[in-house]
Amino acid sequence: MDELQLKLCDIQGRLFELSGTQEIPSEAFIKAFMTSETAKALDSTYNRMQWMGEEYLLEEVKDAAGDILSASGEIFQTDVLYWIGYLYRYWHYYTGEPSNKILRQAPIETMKRNYLMFHTMARELAIEDLKEIHAQKK
């Protein structure tokens, strides 16, 4: 993984964290982001979105999602949000899979439930374990 890719993982982690600080319900935000054109743009080899900061990216997601993000819902702790955002982006670079497919394999509830156990693991191992959990549910 190169330096730019790791920086983009950090930006996505901070984006998820920022959604919590702005009191956007976490499940609604994560689903809206991971299935958005913004996430799709970040998945591409090169896109101008990759050079935007988390504040700009959040506005893009909010504009596209509309009222979905104003519903009530739980707001996860910022460390949990950062880890989920970081790992989802890392997962994309590690496997080449698109964001929407990653979300299907590691749903939000699975990520939240496994945070305490997985956040200290090597990222690759956490991803492989999450893929295994998904495979067992099939």
Regions found by a protein language model. Give the residues of each.
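Thiolate-centered catalytic microenvironments shared by cysteine-dependent enzyme domains
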Residues: N100-L103
